[in-house]
């Protein structure tokens, strides 16, 4: 960050921008400009940059629009991160709770959208430890599920405990939570499909 003359931090959440600003100060990065802006808003007044990065922010209603905006903002290259799994919470656990399984678009969706746009993107994978892997006790497992899904009803807790008692706690959660890093050299606007 010290070799970059100016950094723009863009987010729809003022809270997220405040956290990012505090971290920038801690890192002595004083060459950052903060802009509160949503994916759905116009970006025409945002400065074009050499590199655009969208990390953990691409669960959007219109992926094509988001990828187009990032491509058009970057003179050189775009980097985005996307879920590898289609869910933050195991579908098995969602079913054990008696809930409808909610799966989200993962990196394959973004890659397909980019391909349809005429962008031949690269994919690398980031393997990170799963912070919810320790399910060695019922209490710890329940904390992990609540952290991911919010409060549970008494009936859901009962269903979950019955399910937990039938499992090997070491096999409940994967060892890693993986992300896909998708990147491409920016494409001229007129070349996009």
Task: Kindly give the residue locations of the regions a language model identified.
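Short "lid" loop at the C-terminus of a central beta-strand within the Rossmann-like core
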Residues: 60, 83-88, 126-129
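Conserved Class I S-adenosyl-L-methionine
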Residues: 122-193
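A short, conserved alpha-helix within the catalytic core of class I
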Residues: 58-73
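Short, glycine-/aromatic-enriched active-site segment of Class I SAM-dependent methyltransferases
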Residues: 83-101
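A conserved beta-strand element that flanks and buttresses the S-adenosyl-L-methionine
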Residues: 52-53
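Class I SAM-dependent methyltransferase SAM/SAH-binding core
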Residues: 1-41
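Short alpha-helix
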Residues: 103-118, 122-124, 148
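Short conserved loop adjoining the S-adenosyl-L-methionine
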Residues: 41-47
